[in-house]
Amino acid sequence: ISYSPYKNGMAPLFNVKDINGKNIDLAKLRGKYILIDFWGSWCNPCIAMIPKIKKIHEENPDLIVISIAHDQEDNTLPETRKIIAEKGMDWINIYQCDREMTKPSIATMYNIYAFPTTILIETQKKIIYRDIGNNKYNELNTVIRNQCNSQND
C-alpha cells in the first residue's frame, strides 16, 4: 500500500464556499475521516473515478467526502454543475478556477499536479493516503475500511 509522501503531515486547512454558497471550513470538520477528490470537468479519468467515489461515499456513511473541481479556464462552472447533477455527487462539492483566484487554490495548497488525485485525512487532520489516478480503487477502499473501522472500535 502506498501512503502519502507526506504521511503524518498535517493537511493544509482551507475555508471556502461550496458550489451552493455554503461555508466549508476544514478545521471545523472534526472527528471524522475526510476523503478529498481533486478532479476537473475536462479530465476523463476524473469522470471515470466519480462512480468509485460515489460507492465509497455510500459504503462509508461516517466518511466526509469533498470533491474539488479545479479548472484553469473560466466559464466551466456550468459544465461542472451538470456533471455533479448527472453523476449524483451528493456530497460536498467545491469549484475553483485559477483565473478567478485571489489566493492560492486548494490544489496548490495540497501540491496537486495531476488529476484525479485522492487524499485521505484522519481525524486529527493528518494526511494518511495520497494517490494519483483512478486505478487504485480497491487499495483506497481497503485503507478507508481499515482506518474507519479502527476509529469505531
Give the label of every model feature segment.
Residues 48, 89, 96-145:
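Thiol/disulfide oxidoreductase modules built on the thioredoxin-like
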Residues 33-34, 63, 116:
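Alpha/beta-hydrolase fold active-site loops
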Residues 36, 66-68, 94, 119:
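Conserved hydrophobic packing residues within short motifs/helices of P-loop NTPase cores
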Residues 1-17, 22, 27-32, 58, ...:
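N-proximal helix/coil linker or "cap" segments that precede and/or mark the start of modular domains
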Residues 48-88, 98-108, 142:
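Structural microenvironment flanking redox-active thiols in thiol-disulfide oxidoreductases
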Residues 25-47, 53:
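Short active-site neighborhood of thiol/selenol oxidoreductases, capturing the structured segment around
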Residues 152-153:
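Non-globular targeting/processing and membrane-anchoring segments
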